[in-house]
A protein has these predicted regions:
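Short, well-structured hydrophobic secondary-structure segments
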Residues: 3-6, 10-13, 19-38
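Amphipathic N-proximal alpha-helical interface segments
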Residues: 31-46, 111-115
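Vicinal oxygen chelate
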Residues: 27-35, 52-69, 74-116
Length: 116
């Protein structure tokens, strides 16, 4: 995998379990073919990544799916028991949502990016 591209976007506001929360993370992305690995370093603020670390977990946290219409995919997932727990719309056509469902070990990430 690699090379890795690092992003340090600073604090950003997210809807986190129904509340607005500023969260800061450092990110690095590496690819091999069509597979991408994202390394996330939590820095500050409430988010699912901090929950994961506070619970003593390490390793794979979520699985990302690229979607054309974030809102419709979130609604579809909610219809089968998923709850949206974290997300934001960065700009028109650029948004993210994390979803969880009781009993599922991984969080789902839906990512809409019409700017790529």
């Amino acid at each position: 995998f690699g090379p890795f591209t690092r992003m340090d976007p600073g604090p950003m506001n997210y809807d986190y379990r129904g509340e607005q929360e500023a969260c800061e993370m450092r990110l690095a992305f590496g690819k091999s073919g069509d597979v991408e690995i994202e390394l996330i370093e939590w820095v500050s603020g409430g988010c699912p990544h901090k929950e994961f670390l506070d619970a003593g977990n390490e390793g794979m946290h979520h699985l990302r799916f690229i979607v054309d219409d974030l809102d419709s995919k979130v609604a579809e997932a909610q219809s089968i028991g998923y709850q949206s727990i974290w997300g934001t719309r960065y700009a028109e056509g650029l948004a993210v949502a994390y979803l969880e469902r009781e009993g599922d070990p991984l969080i789902l990430e839906f990512f809409e990016n019409h700017h790529a």
